[in-house]
Structure formats: structure tokens, C-alpha cells
């Protein structure tokens, strides 16, 4: 059987931000795509890192892919 997907209690917006991280986009660029300020994106990133137990973007992307929260792009 496949391992169960962990959702880490991420909000829909946090999942949206996580899905944009593999592109290497800056917080400002992600904000432009989602019509949010850079500060708001940085808050979402801080929450993502905390919930995922990630130290940085690369680790967040790795955890996201391993847990099927994002697909390889």
C-alpha cells in the first residue's frame, strides 16, 4: 500500500505558496502571482517552515514532494 499523505495542517493558501516554491520564485514574485504582499508571503513561508519542520525553502520543497503535498514540476 502507498504511505498515507500527511497534510501537516497546512491552510489552502500555505499549500498554494508551497506549490510555487519549486520554481525558485522570490517572496515578492509569489506575492504578485497570488495578489498578496511580500510580507504576507513571508508570513506564509514562516508558517510553512514551522509546520513542516523545514529550515529553508529547499527542505520545504523536499518535504512537500515526499509527502505528496506538491508534485514534481
Where are each of the predicted segments found?
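Intrinsically disordered, low-complexity segments enriched in glycine/proline and serine/threonine
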Residues: 17-19, 41, 45, 71
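Flexible loop/N-cap segments at domain edges
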Residues: 53-55, 60-71
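Short, locally clustered residues in the helix-turn-helix/winged-helix DNA-binding domain
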Residues: 19-23, 65
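Acidic-residue sensor for enzyme active/binding pockets
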Residues: 14-16, 38, 66
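Recognition helix of helix-turn-helix DNA-binding domains
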Residues: 24-59
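Regulatory hinge/linker segments at domain boundaries
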Residues: 1-20, 73
